[in-house]
């Protein structure tokens, strides 16, 4: 699971199925509910904490760390694999509350693309099959009730040109943004941008973000520095002369 997290950026967690009572669910902790973590730390939870639980109680602190009760051991033969996405702010609050910031929570608190779960799951299955060819998958549950909506932004090409100091055609902008996964459509001067899911978690949300992407891909070093020219028609007073000295 750690390898998959490092390879994809998506945390995963494995439970020993033989130590799970009934069904696995995601729920808020009961006030004062106890949990012993993998690292040996015992927590007294609050109702603000999101947990992974079975029919008998809490088995993991969602997005932070699993519990000791159902941890994977050398003799484990049945595994439940969790590949999940959690709300960033809640995970950060929980990790800070218990002074237990982990590799998983550090990623979740930055708002991970939910679509990345598929990538992490596919890699996990590939590794299971390579390492344990006799493995059998006996069930799959997929809950995605509110799919992430891709951000959509309207930007005028003339607006980009004024700020970047470059004449831009639709082809110029498309050449810079489409390789990054952006979908573009043009209507005269207006450009409609559909942001890919992996950039729709708050990273790209306003037209200034689009301008930054175009400038970045164009290359900041390719923008020529030009001095600001202006004229001063007012009389020079004594204070101005004193400041010049």
Q: What does each model-found stretch correspond to?
A:
Residues 1-241, 245:
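RNA/tRNA-interacting regions in translation and RNA-turnover enzymes
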């Amino acid at each position: 699971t750690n390898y998959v997290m490092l390879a994809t950026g998506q945390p995963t967690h494995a439970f020993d199925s033989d130590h799970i009572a009934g069904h696995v669910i995601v729920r808020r902790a009961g006030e004062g509910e106890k949990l012993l973590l993998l690292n040996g730390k015992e927590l007294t939870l609050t109702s603000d904490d999101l947990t992974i639980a079975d029919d008998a109680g809490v088995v993991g602190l969602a997005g932070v760390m699993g519990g000791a009760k159902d941890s994977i051991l050398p003799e484990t033969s049945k595994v439940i694999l969790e590949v999940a996405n959690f709300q960033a702010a809640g995970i950060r609050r929980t990790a800070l509350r218990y002074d237990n910031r982990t590799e998983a929570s550090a990623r979740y608190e930055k708002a991970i693309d939910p679509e990345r779960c598929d990538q992490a799951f596919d890699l996990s299955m590939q590794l299971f099959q390579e390492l344990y060819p006799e493995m059998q998958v006996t069930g799959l549950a997929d809950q995605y009730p509110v799919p992430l909506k891709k951000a959509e932004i309207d930007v005028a090409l003339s607006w980009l040109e004024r700020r970047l100091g470059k004449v831009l055609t639709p082809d110029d902008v498309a050449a810079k943004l489409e390789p990054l996964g952006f979908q573009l459509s043009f209507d005269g001067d207006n450009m409609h941008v559909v942001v890919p899911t992996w950039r729709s978690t708050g990273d790209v949300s306003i037209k200034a973000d689009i301008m930054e992407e175009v400038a970045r891909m164009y290359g900041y070093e390719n923008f020529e520095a030009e001095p600001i020219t202006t004229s001063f028609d007012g009389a020079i007073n004594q204070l101005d002369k004193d400041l010049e000295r």
